[in-house]
């Protein structure tokens, strides 16, 4: 998967979530997550296995359940961090918990769909 970048802030009313990043659940491998903080921020990388595009059991975007990343480095973080997701969720995003700055998150997933 090509790297995908999303951001949230500055000037966002907190808490505020970034756009969602759809990961490739068919591909193996991990996903690297790089968060670049600018200014005063407190942020959390969140993951969800809910899928609004599921043809059988879709979950509305507003009803999705978001969980904090299993890596505590990117939970209530206040500085730039590098993390990885070893279990690939369907979606991830960055949540700006508080602050007046911004956070930019870039996600790159390794691996390809096995045949």
Predicted regions and their residues:
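Surface-exposed loop/edge segments in extracytoplasmic proteins
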Residues: 2-5, 52-65, 69
């Amino acid at each position: 998967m090509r790297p995908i970048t999303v951001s949230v802030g500055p000037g966002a009313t907190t808490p505020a979530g970034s756009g969602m990043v759809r990961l490739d659940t068919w591909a193996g491998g991990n996903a690297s997550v790089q968060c670049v903080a600018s200014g005063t921020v407190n942020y959390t990388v969140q993951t969800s296995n809910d899928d609004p595009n599921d043809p059988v059991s879709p979950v509305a975007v507003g009803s999705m359940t978001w969980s904090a990343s299993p890596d505590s480095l990117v939970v209530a973080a206040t500085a730039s961090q590098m993390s990885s997701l070893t279990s690939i969720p369907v979606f991830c995003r960055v949540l700006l918990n508080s602050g007046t700055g911004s956070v930019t998150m870039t996600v790159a997933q390794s691996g390809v769909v096995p045949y």
